[in-house]
Amino acid sequence: MIIKPFNAVHIGLFVFAAAVIMLLYFCLSRTKEKTRRWVIVAICIANIVGFLIYKVALSHDADFLRISGIVRFNWWNELPLQLCNINMFLIPIGLLTGRRSITGFSFFVAPLGAVMALVFPESAFCGYSLFLPRMLGFYGTHIVIFICGISLATLGIYRPRLGDFPGIYLTLCCLAGGAHAVNLILRRTVCPFANYFYTYPADISILRLFWRWIPCPLLYLLPGLLILGAYMLTLWGTFALCEKAGASFGKHHKK
């Protein structure tokens, strides 16, 4: 089962994700919100464990090193500090602390980061069997992040608001700036190719395009803010329409 962007296996993965999101909704929609929160937290914890197993397997994958052009596996380059996998921690933190700003960031950014990773994978994760350990780890962890992010809204834990957008942008910019600082430190010490949040150009088609437009570390990601804005508006509008339709249906049903 070879997987690459938009082939049958790749599309099937997103169909599977949609099915899981619907299943979670039908199984949990009538439960207490506390129960729904803990289910999402438990899924994230399981995903963190899976992520660690995936990285251990990756550290022994000679093919991954060859394709990526890396001489030796470096754990400092595999920390969960990317735009998508950092949400494995942010989602539980937001749910357990009740911080709306964190939960809102995870709802909008976690699915987008996961989708970007899955649609524009690095060379080592494109065109190989889905059943290779590194492929299962990469696609598995990202699809679970996508499911958890979307489920924050479908389960009624978080309701998107336009007023959340400025805080989400601020949070993203702070995290990106912090990631770039981490990259600068690691590149000068223990990991010369550290690239969290991809603040330096990477072997990803859309990022290569951004770099051609703005050949400057960190700043070359600015076009991504436009994509994020369009994505957030789309999600907000979709959920607003669904809520309105649901309310109208409920009102009509009562009559």
Language-model segments: which ranges?
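Non-cytosolic membrane-interface motifs at loop->transmembrane helix junctions
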Residues: L65-P80, G127-G140
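Alpha-helical transmembrane segments in multipass membrane proteins, preferentially the mid-helix core
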Residues: V20-F26, L90-I91, V144-G163
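Juxtamembrane "helix-exit" motif on the non-cytosolic side of transmembrane helices
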Residues: Y54-I67, V119-L130
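Membrane-proximal helix-loop-helix units in multi-pass membrane proteins
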Residues: L95-G149, A153
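Membrane-interface transmembrane-helix boundary segments in multi-pass integral membrane proteins
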Residues: M1-F16, G163, G167-Y169, C174, ...
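Hydrophobic core of alpha-helical transmembrane segments in multi-pass integral membrane proteins
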Residues: H10-S29, C44-K55, A176, H180, ...
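Membrane-interface helix-boundary motifs at transmembrane edges
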Residues: C27-I40, L96-G104, L155-P166
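Aromatic-anchored segments of alpha-helical transmembrane domains
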Residues: A46-V56, A110-E122, L172-N183
